[in-house]
Amino acid sequence: QVYNWIHDSIHEVIHMNYKDLQNGTLFPQAITEFLEWCGEEYIFFTWGNQDVMELQRNMKFYNLLELLPGPVTYYDVQKLYSISYDDGTHRCALEHAIDELKIEKSKGFHRALADAWYTAEVLKKINNIIIINHPSLDVYQNPKKKKDEIHISYPDHDKYVSREFATRERIMKDREVTSTRCPVCHLPAKRKLRWFMNNPKVYYSISNCEEHGLIRGKIR
């Protein structure tokens, strides 16, 4: 419906060409039926942090974004695997995780159903407490009003998703955005190093909690 061909580099990964898709279900029908199948209560589990955003981008293109209100909470199994078996920051390929966990490779990779099955197999190897404590939030659809803002507490940090601001200056004048609380005791921390820019999109600061020590703040 949008592209008349598949780029060679994509073809090498997914081993499909445009002819394979000609008899497929059109996206508006596919996403509508998929969300109906999901029902009222569902949670997305993905491998990586791009799938939920790309899904919403496609839905927006077809004027169907109202079917999936955001921001969308989901669980990134790639991140959960790193927290469980690596350093928490490194992100590995799905096949690498399958090899490390000695899960049988009975299907090919880079196909939707097969990768979903492998992701579920990795998920089975992760402690439920780690899963529950580390939700991800896709903000392709940002909060529009103060009442819609989101606060999430993780074991080692807090996340605050604010409403949209018209300018950078307004962001940095907002007290709640620029304040810092300790992620352990949740009390206000004393600023040690004022907010500074690391690049045009990110600000950092250093604050101190008398009981729990130094805290790095980040605004992006």
Language-model region placement:
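Conserved non-catalytic scaffold segment of RNase H-like nuclease domains
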Residues: Q1-Q56, G213-I219
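Acidic, Mg2+-coordinating catalytic module of metal-dependent nucleases/exonucleases
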Residues: I43-N49, E54-N58, A93-H157
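Substrate-recognition/cap helix-loop segment adjacent to the acidic, metal-dependent catalytic center
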Residues: M53-V72
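Acidic two-metal-ion nuclease catalytic site recognized across multiple nuclease folds
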Residues: K125-R220
